[in-house]
């Protein structure tokens, strides 16, 4: 997900973890990372929190939390001609977070229906 503050963009990286013992019925914990190379205004930050709550707050048997992941540079890629750059960028973010996940192999066409103009 892309969030814009003036001319700059930040991203949300969402990690959904299945919890075996959550209320003895399973469940999920969702970690949301606000990936940004700049400091958001207070209002923009509140908007992100509100968006997360609207998206995840009413989910049954689910908890979530958001952390900020500061990066040095904004993701820069040749949209829409190099969509695989997104996979490489996300894999690097996952590595920075110390999460042991490898994204599956992808092709450019896997991104065909993701853009919502």
UniProtKB/Swiss-Prot annotation:
It comes from the Bacteria. This is Uncharacterized protein YnaF. It comes from Bacillus subtilis (strain 168).
């Amino acid at each position: 997900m892309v969030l814009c503050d003036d001319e700059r963009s930040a991203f949300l990286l969402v990690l959904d973890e299945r919890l075996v013992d959550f209320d003895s019925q399973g469940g999920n914990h969702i970690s949301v990372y606000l990936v940004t190379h700049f400091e958001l205004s207070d209002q923009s930050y509140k908007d992100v929190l509100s968006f997360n709550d609207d998206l995840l707050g009413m989910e049954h048997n689910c908890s979530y939390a958001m952390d900020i992941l500061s990066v040095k540079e904004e993701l820069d890629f040749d949209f829409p001609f190099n969509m695989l750059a997104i996979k490489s960028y996300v894999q690097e973010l996952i590595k920075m977070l110390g999460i042991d996940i490898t994204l599956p192999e992808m092709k450019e066409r896997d991104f065909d229906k993701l853009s919502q103009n």
